[in-house]
Amino acid sequence: MRAAYVDSSCLVAVAFSEAGSTRVKRSLQSFEVLLSSNLLEAELRAAARRESIAADPAQLISAISWVYPDRPLTSEITTVLDTGYVRGADLWHLAVALFVDPHREIAFLTLNTRQREISQQLGFSGM
């Protein structure tokens, strides 16, 4: 089963038809399972509001299987920060991906350069 953890940057690019969104769509469609923290929904809806886009992102997020950690992610957060600095929301998404797949067999999809670098250093594949 091909699975990927999806960072908000990918769905924001698709929602706003940003440069590279066609590549992102193809990549998303190539996976059988798409995973993300429910933080993705908040980030996507906030971006839509900021840009005054009235469209409901429900269709974009309908393919996502939500991950709800049942414990603090202190260990995963420490692992990410020991690898390198990323901002808070980017850190959370990487930590949740480690929670879901500590063996790093899933892909980590992001358009954020720094987050991609750290995800690769952690051993995740990408787009």
Regions found by a protein language model. Name each.
Residues M1-R2, F31-L34, A63-S65, P102-A107:
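Short active-site oxyanion
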Residues M1-S36, A48-A58:
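Short, well-structured N-terminal submotif of metal-dependent ribonuclease cores
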Residues L11-V12, E41, Q115-R116:
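A generic structural signal for short hydrophobic patches within well-formed alpha-helices
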Residues A15-F16, L40, Y85-V86:
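Short coil/turn segments
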Residues S21, L35-V80:
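Active-site-proximal, substrate-binding regions of enzyme catalytic domains
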Residues L34, G123-G126:
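Hydrophobic beta-strand scaffold residues
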Residues W66-E117, F124:
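Active-site neighborhoods of divalent-metal-dependent phosphate/nucleic-acid chemistry enzymes
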